[in-house]
Amino acid sequence: MRLYQLSSQSLQFPDPNHALDDPNGLLAVGGDLSVARLKAAYRQGIFPWFSPGEPILWWSPNPRAVLFPDELHVSRSMKKFLKRHTFHATLNQAFDDVIHACAHEHHDGTWITSEIISAYRQLHLAGKAHSVEVWQDDKLVGGLYGVEQGRLFCGESMFSRTDNASKYALLAFQQHFIHHGGHLIDCQVLNAHTASLGVSEIPRDRFLQQLSQWQDLAVDDGCWLPQQLAEPTL
């Protein structure tokens, strides 16, 4: 396997199955973060991930971390929390605030650079990137953002300024997504936090099959309109 150099004259990506094993999933370098290129990348299960000072790096890891929405795990402590919380969640009400908060949360080694923020803001304005906000006393305390691919949602990052806020964002979103016909949430790479929520790993080829199956099927009307999300029910 070799690392591919993207052409500035073409939006074409190499086959994700040609990604390197070490580092896991690294596929290509270069190109840009235009809306057109990001759309082309997500259609093939590829996403950008790089640190300040690095060139743009494109990834498609194997295995892939995913959440089948009906397999979301809610811990006993979270169930107790949901009975007494003071949160409410919204959709697409404060995208810029959410992505900046995600960048700040990971400031010690963030991959959410100013380039990424600008690119995903344009993707949001194009109707492809979306945010979930969690509020407490009218203050933004948690949230997440990602990219929709039909009935599949590619989660990018989440943040929490108080206990359980990011978990609440995911709970409220997955309920909303299922209600509107969503089938799969892509979490890219497994970590301890997402594993505790029921995220699991599947082989890349199975993920790509799921992507092909769901990305050209639309969710129900109204799914991505700015709105308040319903309380999570268990």
From Swiss-Prot:
User: Its GO biological process terms?
Assistant: protein catabolic process
Keyword tags = Acyltransferase, Cytoplasm, Transferase
- Keyword Lipid metabolism assigned to the entry: answer is no
Q: Which GO terms describe its cellular component?
A: cytoplasm
**Principal location:** cytoplasm
Location relative to the cell: Cytoplasm
Pfam families, A to Z: Leu_Phe_trans
Record's InterPro entries? Acyl_CoA_acyltransferase, Leu/Phe-tRNA_Trfase, Leu/Phe-tRNA_Trfase_C, Leu/Phe-tRNA_Trfase_N
Enzyme's top EC category: transferase
Q: Which GO terms describe its molecular function?
A: leucyl-tRNA--protein transferase activity
EC number(s) given by UniProt: 2.3.2.6
Reaction(s) this enzyme catalyzes, per UniProt: N-terminal L-lysyl-[protein] + L-leucyl-tRNA(Leu) = N-terminal L-leucyl-L-lysyl-[protein] + tRNA(Leu) + H(+); N-terminal L-arginyl-[protein] + L-leucyl-tRNA(Leu) = N-terminal L-leucyl-L-arginyl-[protein] + tRNA(Leu) + H(+); L-phenylalanyl-tRNA(Phe) + an N-terminal L-alpha-aminoacyl-[protein] = an N-terminal L-phenylalanyl-L-alpha-aminoacyl-[protein] + tRNA(Phe)
**What does this chain do?**
Functions in the N-end rule pathway of protein degradation where it conjugates Leu, Phe and, less efficiently, Met from aminoacyl-tRNAs to the N-termini of proteins containing an N-terminal arginine or lysine.
Family assignment?
Answer: Belongs to the L/F-transferase family.
**Entry-linked HAMAP family:** Leu_Phe_trans (MF_00688)
Q: Which PANTHER family match?
A: LEUCYL/PHENYLALANYL-TRNA--PROTEIN TRANSFERASE, LEUCYL_PHENYLALANYL-TRNA--PROTEIN TRANSFERASE
Name the record gives this protein = Leucyl/phenylalanyl-tRNA--protein transferase
Phylogenetic classification of the source organism:
Bacteria, Pseudomonadati, Pseudomonadota, Gammaproteobacteria, Enterobacterales
Coding gene? aat
